[in-house]
């Protein structure tokens, strides 16, 4: 078992030595522009890159992050983004509660959870695309 491992390591080492040019410089091109392993920013493409750039600016275009909780009073309600004029909302009410209270939230004034009285307000939201 150990001899197989040593033979495998020896083969890899000889391949690495053959990959060098006549002057001893490596012929293999690195993936990153600066050399070495690319960073997440250099490697990300598409939607992942768009989300990373938005996060760097402090934005959340696809609602990936949890909403910021407020006190939930009538003067400072929890803001619920929606692309329509109504949205269904789930309230846990208490920290150790295992039941979710679901209710419809409509555009306009802040509305209360029927169970605990926490206030929620629907705010318009535009999609990123």
Swiss-Prot record:
Transit peptide: 1-31
Pfam families per UniProt: COX5B
MF-aspect GO terms: metal ion binding
Recorded superkingdom: Eukaryota
Annotated Zn(2+) binding sites: 91, 93, 113, 116
Xref: SUPFAM superfamilies: Rubredoxin-like
Signal peptide per UniProt: none
Modified residues (N6-acetyllysine): 68, 86, 121
Compartments, record wording: Mitochondrion inner membrane
CDD domains: Cyt_c_Oxidase_Vb
Pathway info: Energy metabolism; oxidative phosphorylation
Topology of this chain in the membrane: Peripheral membrane protein
Keywords: Acetylation, Membrane, Metal-binding, Mitochondrion, Mitochondrion inner membrane, Transit peptide, Zinc
Record keyword Manganese present: no
Cross-referenced InterPro entries: Cyt_c_oxidase_su5b, Cyt_c_oxidase_su5b_sf
GO terms of biological process kind: mitochondrial electron transport, cytochrome c to oxygen
GO CC entries: mitochondrial inner membrane; respiratory chain complex IV
Primary location class: mitochondrion
Transmembrane segments: none
Family assignment from sequence similarity: Belongs to the cytochrome c oxidase subunit 5B family.
Function: Component of the cytochrome c oxidase, the last enzyme in the mitochondrial electron transport chain which drives oxidative phosphorylation. The respiratory chain contains 3 multisubunit complexes succinate dehydrogenase (complex II, CII), ubiquinol-cytochrome c oxidoreductase (cytochrome b-c1 complex, complex III, CIII) and cytochrome c oxidase (complex IV, CIV), that cooperate to transfer electrons derived from NADH and succinate to molecular oxygen, creating an electrochemical gradient over the inner membrane that drives transmembrane transport and the ATP synthase.
Subunit structure as annotated in this protein's UniProt entry: Component of the cytochrome c oxidase (complex IV, CIV), a multisubunit enzyme composed of 14 subunits. The complex is composed of a catalytic core of 3 subunits MT-CO1, MT-CO2 and MT-CO3, encoded in the mitochondrial DNA, and 11 supernumerary subunits COX4I1 (or COX4I2), COX5A, COX5B, COX6A2 (or COX6A1), COX6B1 (or COX6B2), COX6C, COX7A1 (or COX7A2), COX7B, COX7C, COX8B and NDUFA4, which are encoded in the nuclear genome.
Protein's name according to its UniProt entry: Cytochrome c oxidase subunit 5B, mitochondrial
Species this chain originates from: Bos taurus (Bovine)
